[in-house]
Design a protein with these regions (language model features):
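Catalytic centers of hydrolytic enzymes
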Residues: 1-275
């Protein structure tokens, strides 16, 4: 039997909750395209790094994509849309890493991401892809050799990744985003996700943190879910604006070198997902 008294008793509360979750919390000024991260610094990854760097005073952010090949459309964002913008329940973790450890971390990340290529470069597959059978179609198809969930890039520093160099000598960090010196023996605060903090992807182990105790000893802050951070960012700033989240004095810059590399990786991405 329908309980009208119960409905009337909670109608005001229901209306408040509905109004909140359907209410606008902010705006995406320009659509964010995730696939660009494979071959260059992009607005989408700048957005993820900026979220981490807005929640705690860190020197460096380390993050992978949340979307393998997706888009965050421009326009108003309602509270109930936050899960679409940030689809995982990751939380923020801040830990201390030396410059040398950050360098090793990035070397391991890009080793999962790219091949070392030599001349002639014209037909080289820079992105680590392979052909294997697609069991849904029965045909051969291009696939990533490794999971992009472990393709971490960094913000807060300026660096290059040379695809002609072997593992261990690809990443060159020139300086911090603000122009100050990057030092191998100095400790920095680095933002990562809970996914990464439990050892996923093996990047912290590659950096020299051999076990969970080593990681725990370095943690200086455990933050809220990134969805909460995103909500707070909207309330404070009103929008996700590529011109703001891409501020080079905050997020720094990175790129693949030599010049042919980004276009070659983009061509590999198009083999995976089409143009």
């Amino acid at each position: 039997e329908y309980d009208t008294a119960m409905e009337e008793a909670f109608e005001a509360d229901y209306d408040k909750v509905r109004s909140f979750i359907t209410g606008t919390v902010g705006e995406i000024k320009k659509g964010l395209v995730s696939r660009e991260f494979y071959y260059k610094q992009c607005d989408y990854m700048n957005f993820l790094h900026t979220l981490a760097m807005s929640a705690y005073p860190v020197d460096i952010s380390l993050s992978a994509t949340l979307l393998i090949d997706g888009k965050v459309p421009a326009g108003e964002v309602r509270y109930q849309d936050i899960r679409k913008v940030y689809p995982y329940e990751n939380k923020l973790v801040v830990l201390r890493l030396t410059g040398a450890e950050i360098l090793k971390y990035l070397e391991a990340s890009y080793d999962a991401w790219i091949n070392t290529v030599t001349e002639p470069y014209e037909n080289a597959h820079v992105l680590k892809i392979k052909q294997s059978k697609d069991y849904s179609t029965g045909k051969m198809a291009w696939k990533l050799a490794k999971s992009p969930a472990n393709f971490d890039s960094a913000a807060g520093i300026n660096y290059t990744v040379d695809v002609t160099k072997p593992y261990g000598s690809r990443v060159v960090i020139t300086d911090m985003a603000d122009g100050s010196k990057f030092e191998l023996d100095k400790e920095y605060t680095a933002a990562i996700t809970t996914y990464r903090s439990v050892g996923s992807g093996g990047l912290l182990k590659a950096a020299g943190l051999e076990d969970m105790k080593s990681v725990e000893d370095r943690i200086v802050y455990r933050g809220p879910e990134f969805r909460t951070i995103l909500y707070r960012y909207f309330k404070k700033n009103g929008s996700i604006d590529p011109a703001v989240v891409g501020d080079p004095k905050v997020v720094g810059s990175w790129k693949f070198v030599p010049e042919f590399a980004p276009a070659a990786i983009k061509a590999d991405v198009e083999l995976l997902y089409g143009k």
